[in-house]
Amino acid sequence: MKKFALIVGIVALAIFSFLYIQLYRVQSAINEQLAQQNIAVQSINLSLFSPALSLENIKTTQFSAQKIEAKFSFLPLLYGNAALHSLNIQQLKLTQNTQNPANVSIEISPFSLKQLLSKKVILNGENHIRIEFNKPIYGKTKTFHFSFHKANLDFSTSESTPLQFVDASLNNQPIGYIETHTAHQQIVTYIKPQCDNDCLAVLKYQQIDNQSAVNFSGKYFPVQRLFALLNLPEMLSGHADFDLDFSFSSSSLIQGKLNFLAQNGEILGVNLLDMVAQYFPINYNNDLLQNKELNTRFEQFYLQLFLQQNQLIAEKIELKTPALLGQGKGIIDLNRMECNVDINLNSTDQRYQNLTLPINFFGNCNSPQYKINFTKKFRHQLIDAIKEKLR
């Protein structure tokens, strides 16, 4: 029995010694790469029982981090092949004065560390990246989930680094193919989702010192997918042309604006025709009212939005449907996802263009309540419209 225990002990010691040697080789390879890239690290630590390598207080010309921990698969390490399967980055800062650092966790299909340190990297299988900022970027949004099934990363040139992602998703929304190019202080990303017609979105990021700017624009992009990506309430369907600008100082959002034009979609959870039919002296045909218990079909829906602290200010709202025209403005509270919108509706029928119905929508943006503002002006307009119809 003692001999058996001794043999087991010797085998275990041999295994852990071998693991230590493999991890030490990994550490040496990483040290070499750190020196080549001029990356300063306070300390590097090894862990055997859950094979891992951790770096403390990392500083480069491009970013800094409190800690980076790389975890390796156990079995491949026994065969002398260090295979990385997860990477955790604590308190990542893109500039020294960043006031809103992020924690990043990366889970990838195990692959050889030799490949990771090469000029070109190919990732296959399920891969997940989770980014959580210390403070919300806007509203309650501070966490982003990114996943993909395949990636090609090319670091062979210092001037431009192309990154390609296939079957990608952001915040559980499929966004298809992504191609990113980095050059100097600018990053340009092209997003090509699967859609009925040609649709494309372009994300541009530029940083100068502590100031950074993001421009996100698109053509014929699926509206519901766009709102989900931005963590906005799901209010519309259809396809949209949009242009969004964000400005940051030390990673804190200071300004944002959005111009948005959706076409051939629906306002979800609200039927304006059903509301208007109670007050407008208009006869609607069956085609217009066939979805009266569901949504409002529109031909065009235009929004001009500004971000002010945790509120989206809708400075201009313009709506065009086969039967109605609308203009308005409002506020969206991003913390509570509550809306307060005033919109004035007119009929497309020229006989009733002087009749304007003022409606106020309020409460939960996904299922808002409404009230008709029966002003003295509206009552006079309604009486005149009824008289006109009875002539």
Swiss-Prot record:
Cross-referenced InterPro entries, in alphabetical order?
Answer: AsmA-related
Q: Where found?
A: Membrane
> Could you state one GO cellular component term attached to this entry?
membrane
Q: What is this protein called?
A: Uncharacterized protein HI_0134
Predominant localisation class: membrane
For this UniProt record, the keywords arranged alphabetically read as follows:
Membrane, Transmembrane, Transmembrane helix
Q: Where is the signal peptide?
A: none
Q: Which PANTHER family match?
A: DUF748 DOMAIN-CONTAINING PROTEIN
How does this chain sit within the bilayer? Single-pass membrane protein
State the source organism's domain of life.
Bacteria
The membrane-spanning stretches of this chain are 4-24
